Amino acid sequence: MLTRSSGVLMHITSLPNAFGIGSFGQSAYEFVDFLVETKQTYWQILPLTTTSYGDSPYQSFSAIAGNTHLIDFDLLTQMDLLKEADYALVNFGDDPTNVDYERVFYVRRTILEIAVKNFLANQAFQADFKNFEKNNQLWLDDFAEFMAIKEYFGNQALQKWDDKKAVARDPKTLEKYRTMLADQIQYFKVTQYFFFKQWTELKNYANQKGIQIIGDMPIYVAADSVEVWTKPELFQLDEERNPLFVAGVPADQFSATGQLWGNPLYAWEEHKKQGYAWWIHRIEESFKIYDVLRIDHFKGFSDYWQVDGKAEVAKDGSWQPGPGYDLFKAVKEQLGDLPIIAEDLGNIDDKARKLLTDCNYPGMKILQFGFEDVSGESLDSPHYCIPHSIVYTGTHDNDVTNGWYNSLTEQQQQYINDYTHRYEDESICQAMIRQLFATVSNTAIATMQDVLDLPASSRMNVPSTIGGNWQWRMQQSDLTQDKKDFLEKMTTLYQRANQEK
């Protein structure tokens, strides 16, 4: 990310298809072709890990296992694991512009069970599957067992399982469930094989076309996760694996009362004793599926916001010291220099800035934040961008540009129009993308919603809210030739065109 470049932020779930949720199928390959056509370098996505309650990719049952909602049925059909009749008439949802997660959860399971049954009955796949099991044994068995037992208890959270011996991982109890739930455990292993096979093939296609994938790693894991189940010593928990303290942030740009995330906090002293082995493994696994890695909430590594585990809001918390450079020094010693982006938004102080400097990771700039301050003093303003940074119009947590602009005061709108020298026939999305690509930041990322000039209804997430998020889906008809032409023109004009292809 040392040369001028650009890309588009678009999560897999937002891709168009007939299966209720975006997948690794034809539309994903067509999206890569669109990026190539418009001379982009990066496709940025949200975490690919499993989603849980609230459908957030930042609250996962596993820090490593993939989201099987993204498995493409047509690709399974090409492997002779499904027939089109198995899914052609299924109702995946009534609104093609939004994901119906509850419906997707139930109907996809039935179809995937057919594919798994056919897969296990076909000897031709078994050698490759055994290699997959062997190469992923550090996490795959635990994940499959966790999910099978969780399902057995009605998908209740780990802490609410009826069998406390299972929660505590009593060896005899676990052996009982391994025998009783053998078929279900195998289902979760095979669907992970499907996920990683399809994603690897898509990523290889993108890389061959000169497109790199920017992935995303949440700083925390969910309380209801395989990590909390198998490695409780790495978290601040009570004897029943309930979080003693939970994560969040105080009041910021996104919420006046702060954000209560609810994730268990790390027992950093224990991580240090173990040489940060869990983190090194997690980051190593991330770079097997991404080319560049954005680490969410980088501030939390210098100081993290600690809230009582029973609190209802995040504002009554306190800052506690994180591991600092000690963690990233250990990562560098084991894995070398890595292309990492630090999400350094929010309450960034001198200590966090020093950590960013010590790590030499590029930080982020958000033009929406910069333009909200009509004094021009915001460090997110275009004139304060620096080459060693990634600049965005907004992220998945921001409103899309149309919605954001319409929420501003007349003074703020006039400031933006004056600053960008907005043309009379130019949409606000075009003006913002033009300004974005003109900055000195080495990498500029536009959201797909802004590329498509979409309204506020296409917003991906409203922080500190539950329900109604992560649902937006693009329609193929949204991507018209004039939208492609504009993106390519801005990319070329501001010297960001991909030189690889």
Describe the role of every protein-language-model region:
Residues Q26-T51, I289-Y290:
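Catalytic domains of carbohydrate-active enzymes, especially glycoside hydrolases
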Residues M1-R4, L9-E37, T191:
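Asp/Glu-centered strand-loop micro-motifs enriched in Gly/Pro and often flanked by an aromatic residue
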